[in-house]
Swiss-Prot record:
InterPro entries for this protein: Tnp_ISXO2-like, Transposase_27_IS1, Transposase_Zn_ribbon
Keywords: Plasmid, Transposable element
GO biological process: DNA transposition
Bridged cysteine pairs (disulfide): none
Signal peptide: none
Pfam families: DDE_Tnp_IS1595, Zn_ribbon_IS1595
Protein source organism: Halobacterium salinarum (strain ATCC 700922 / JCM 11081 / NRC-1)
Descriptive protein name: Uncharacterized protein in transposable element ISH50
């Protein structure tokens, strides 16, 4: 159930922000000192004074919600529906009655605050890649129009506006990671698999040639299926989990038409967060979403 009371009361929204922001204790955002005292209020937010640097701040200072004339409850509704319901920014513009540019800037600021995925692999691990068409949307037209003829053969790259996105499915922990790259190369694959708990990590892949060097590396035990030969499952060897997760990622990107390749990473981090809160009740999901960005 959606946490409706938080979305209609500015006081409740402010209290929730303070609860999450200072969950490890109040400190000064400027000098990080903990010697602070209450110092009046600013609108519905508690104000503080730092005894070390003599600066004042409030519950919003230093967060993605600071310096905004829009009510905090509206921003809570925006980030909640954006993550939980995959609502487009154009639709949020209508729902919270705030201009498109204002919503876009604030949502982008929220997305940039999300942590990058750091896979710590236990294994066995499935790894696969899919490709996302992402161009130069949002940039000034400083170059001639590109040809719209038939695409060239081969795998996509950042330069060709078709970015590879790797999906890692750790069967040991059940975690899924979606990580974009500029190219699907051996070096990038090794970097993704570098943080592992075992000396020899079991890796399941398809027949893509970039994975072939793993066969000669003692740090990996690679097993694979060749889709081109009609082979998709061979006992425990398959990448079906990755392909299923990739289809969910494509569906996530669908309402956000024409994502720029320079901004694809934050959108995929939002997708990762959505998978974390998917089964949580409304209030708990909102807390998790805010904790991730604060």
């Amino acid at each position: 159930m959606m946490p409706i009371k938080t979305f209609v009361s500015e006081r409740r929204a402010a209290n929730l922000l303070a609860q999450i922001r200072w969950r490890n204790g109040v400190y000064c955002p400027s000098c990080r000192a903990e010697s602070v005292i209450r110092y009046g209020s600013y609108r519905v937010f508690q104000r503080y004074l730092c005894k070390d640097c003599d600066r004042t701040f409030n519950d919003q200072t230093g967060t993605v919600f600071e310096h905004s004339a829009v009510a905090l409850r509206k921003w809570f509704l925006a980030v909640y529906t954006y993550i939980r319901l995959n609502t487009s920014i154009r639709q949020l513009d209508a729902e919270i009655d705030v201009s498109y540019k204002t919503v876009y800037r604030r949502v982008q600021r929220f997305l940039r605050a999300l942590d990058a995925p750091r896979p710590h692999l236990e294994g066995p691990v499935e790894i696969d890649e899919f490709y996302v068409k992402a161009g130069l949307k949002g940039r000034e037209r400083d170059q001639p129009s590109r040809s719209r003829g038939l695409s060239t053969r081969g795998r996509g790259t950042y330069a060709e506006d078709k970015l590879p996105v790797f999906v890692l499915a750790d069967r040991g922990t059940g975690e899924r990671h979606v990580i974009p790259a500029k190219a699907a190369t051996e070096s990038r694959i090794r970097l993704l698999l570098a943080d592992r708990q075992q000396e020899s990590l079991t890796v399941y892949t398809d027949g893509f040639r970039a994975y072939d060097p793993l066969d000669e590396d003692d740090a990996f035990t690679r097993e694979y299926v060749v889709h081109g030969d009609g082979e998709y499952v061979n006992g425990d060897v398959h990448v079906n989990t990755c392909e299923s997760h990739a289809s969910l990622a494509r569906r996530w990107l669908s309402p956000h038409r024409g994502v720029s390749k320079d901004r694809l990473t934050p959108y995929l981090r939002a997708f990762q967060l959505r998978r974390e809160v998917f089964r949580k009740p409304g209030k708990e999901a909102l807390k998790t979403i805010l904790e991730t960005a604060l």
